[in-house]
Amino acid sequence: MAPPGPASALSTSAEPLSRSIFRKFLLMLCSLLTSLYVFYCLAERCQTLSGPVVGLSGGGEEAGAPGGGVLAGGPRELAVWPAAAQRKRLLQLPQWRRRRPPAPRDDGEEAAWEEESPGLSGGPGGSGAGSTVAEAPPGTLALLLDEGSKQLPQAIIIGVKKGGTRALLEFLRVHPDVRAVGAEPHFFDRSYDKGLAWYRDLMPRTLDGQITMEKTPSYFVTREAPARISAMSKDTKLIVVVRDPVTRAISDYTQTLSKRPDIPTFESLTFKNRTAGLIDTSWSAIQIGIYAKHLEHWLRHFPIRQMLFVSGERLISDPAGELGRVQDFLGLKRIITDKHFYFNKTKGFPCLKKAEGSSRPHCLGKTKGRTHPEIDREVVRRLREFYRPFNLKFYQMTGHDFGWDG
């Protein structure tokens, strides 16, 4: 038999060589796929765990939760890595992202907050309430562990427009057990047909022991609002910030004037017939200040003990005192005290030494503290006479003399 030729020998030696190369290629491919899988798992883990880290630091409130080693808006607790059992749950959750609150409506409470440089007063800033305060959840780690939930509000600031509702809400947000929507939901007056599920979804997440709040000052003058809120929960606590109705009306007009400089004068809008001294109660700036009339609708659905009436004047002169009453009413520990405030002489009202989650002073923005136009003294006198009987009735109904007729 003839010995194998060169071609046959080459074919025989090439076969084991090709099998060896194939096995090496397969091994490298498996190693590459395994490495990619491990990298993917690690990347997913890092993304999931990034929430607590991001939540511990930050700049402006709109861009993210501000902080200084604590988590904004919640109990001041240090973030620690979860136990092994909790890590497993944590890995199954999507990466947490902040939700911006809905844009505020044009209802007269558009005030923003200004962040000041330490030692300065009235400096412009970049964070705000309403449209610019981010809903940074309290205890981000706890929320990532599915320990927080969205609840319907247990307390609502229902009024009044230009009474000081924005200031009250922002002061309350300093409290670690208060979680509030920054923007005004306007659910019970404009969006009721969207349903309670939609309303609940607007709320920030809360932990056990925390209170969910919102404020929409137009509720107080909305006829349907009392019945609608009662239908949601008869136990809802209601807060009304009231102010001298004459001053409130002028402030209301001043705000409108800043947006529409071509409107008639305050004096011409106040009277149906100035000669006869007949006040035009259909003008909203006047109508809102008839507090006793609006309160009657609320008392048909809520007992007076479930309503707290906050003085807008005292909120300026003694913010800590009024906040003490509010905290008691809400069943909260008195954490907000004098140490949280300083009086800004330039603006003429108190500011927070430390706003929610910030290490710098915050004041209500440029839209607050506008200079009021000069109003005819005779018009002011007639307005005071008009409001006096309504004020006296309001004092009797609430059991509190606000001193607007002194």
Swiss-Prot record:
Sequence ranges on the Lumenal membrane side: 44-406
An annotated Gene Ontology molecular function: sulfotransferase activity
Topological region Cytoplasmic: 1-24
Positions contributing to 3'-phosphoadenylyl sulfate binding: K162, G163, G164, T165, R166, R243, S251, K368, G369, R370, T371, H372
Entry's Gene Ontology cellular component terms: Golgi membrane; membrane
UniProt source species: Homo sapiens (Human)
Glycosylated residue positions: N273, N344
Reaction catalysis annotation: alpha-D-glucosaminyl-[heparan sulfate](n) + 3'-phosphoadenylyl sulfate = 3-sulfo-alpha-D-glucosaminyl-[heparan sulfate](n) + adenosine 3',5'-bisphosphate + H(+)
Regions that span the bilayer: 25-43
Name under which the protein is recorded: Heparan sulfate glucosamine 3-O-sulfotransferase 3A1
Role description: Sulfotransferase that utilizes 3'-phospho-5'-adenylyl sulfate (PAPS) to catalyze the transfer of a sulfo group to an N-unsubstituted glucosamine linked to a 2-O-sulfo iduronic acid unit on heparan sulfate. Catalyzes the O-sulfation of glucosamine in IdoUA2S-GlcNS and also in IdoUA2S-GlcNH2. The substrate-specific O-sulfation generates an enzyme-modified heparan sulfate which acts as a binding receptor to Herpes simplex virus-1 (HSV-1) and permits its entry. Unlike HS3ST1/3-OST-1, does not convert non-anticoagulant heparan sulfate to anticoagulant heparan sulfate.
EC number: 2.8.2.30
Membership in a protein family: Belongs to the sulfotransferase 1 family.
Location relative to the cell: Golgi apparatus membrane
